[in-house]
Curated annotation (Swiss-Prot):
PANTHER family, per the entry: ADENINE DEAMINASE, N-ACETYLGLUCOSAMINE-6-PHOSPHATE DEACETYLASE
Keyword set, alphabetical order: Hydrolase, Manganese
Lineage: Archaea, Methanobacteriati, Methanobacteriota, Stenosarchaea group, Methanomicrobia
Co-factor(s): Mn(2+)
Matches recorded under HAMAP family: Adenine_deamin (MF_01518)
Name of this protein: Adenine deaminase
EC main group: hydrolase
Amino acid sequence: MDFGVKDGRIIGFGEYRGTREYDLSGAYVVPGLIDAHVHIESSLLAPAEYARLVLAHGTTTVIADPHEIANVCGAPGIDYMLAQGARTPLDILVMLPSCVPATPFDAGGAVLTAADLARFRGREGVVGLAEVMNVPGVLFGDEDLRAKMDLFEVVDGHAPFLSGKDLNAYIYAGVQSDHECTALPEAREKLLRGMYVMIREGSTERNLHDLLPLVDACTAPRCCFATDDRHADMLAGEGHIDDCVRKAVSGGLEVEQALRMATLSAAGRFGLHDRGALAPGRLADFCVADDPDRFRVLRTFKRGVEVVDAGYLPPACPKSPMHARVPEPGDIRITGRGEARVIEIVPGQITTRDLRYPVDAAGIPDLDRDILKAVVIDRYRATGSGVGLVHGFHLQEGAIAGSVSHDSHNIVAVGAGDADIVRAVAEVVRLGGGLAVVSGDDITALPLECAGLMSALPYDEVVRRLAALEEHARRLGAIANPFMYLSFLALTVIPEVRVTERGVFDVGAFTDVPLFEE
């Protein structure tokens, strides 16, 4: 069936004559795909390069939470993302960060109050309040958080494992969605209590397979896809929301329901009634696929115009605060003996487990039991470093470090020896922000000039350098996607235990705890 487009919108279906006509015979036309929740910064790409990459995969709208750059740069970071987004064909719609810092325990580069967010209200491209991570603040009536929620009609959630009456109270307070579900019973409870459930498939947060049974013809309108945190190499290799559609269909979901989640359901969740469907009056945002089951995107159209590669557009990067003091090996030495708290990495998830191991500090690293040292360095005020123990990185030598460390984005490192940890941290500081793998004098690195979070390089070069980092880390024995797991080690709003610039943090107890049990 033919359809016509005028001034960026679909005018109708039937026979129309146009100044330019496209023959799409034999292909399938699908509404432009929508990512319901993403941190663009996690791709390690500046917004223009991110747009180039995901547009090629049929995505025409992303709902972005810029809380990574906001934690580093404050309100100017949000201004940067809005301005950069306005320069791309991709619609980058912003949910304002609700928790900067993520918790009162986090030491980042900025604090954003309700008054700070109020100036963005009504600004073009701003659609609501992003994931409310401070669950205790909601439940116990934090006044500034309440004021932030009152600014916006659309409020996203972040409530891993929240259940029962606490979940009731969280929803009653005005939170409408969650993207943190990792198990089917949790997702069902939240859906039955009226929340939108965003099924997440990121580089390490791979929840689609486990949550797919949630979706059927009745529930699909309340479910959508989100990538949350997906590195550039995964975007280039596996895709974006098109990847979620393919995985859902191969997992047994009807293609119509998968496409609805990727389009109309996501648009409806955010009140974007101008997109998400091919209908008169809607934006002419659509992609062309070879087959709905394989769903290989061939072409993408934005407001009726085919999106072509406009070439590399160097970003005007915000300054990256970097006042970290590179530690001496003695600064990160631990002492003691006994039952130690050890952070266990959970493959395919960003949650961790709080383990207990008998440990003699003199025997760390313990390569036989895969117990390594994890270090977090304050990059904003040079106040020092915190040390914890981690199981699951599998490094047999060397160290990895980076300035991408949710949500405060201090410098985080894991290594099989103090000297290499120090070298890796020193390389990140030298770069002014970035990722590094170090083994002796052998160093592989990726500079992240934009706030220590995003690269100023074209996406294909970022993908190449990421591959070099991964290969170097692999030779040292590291787990796959080590930098994505590394980036979540200090995230104090995801259970069970973390490490910050102060030391070990118990998420359930919501407090700092000693490394060795007393």
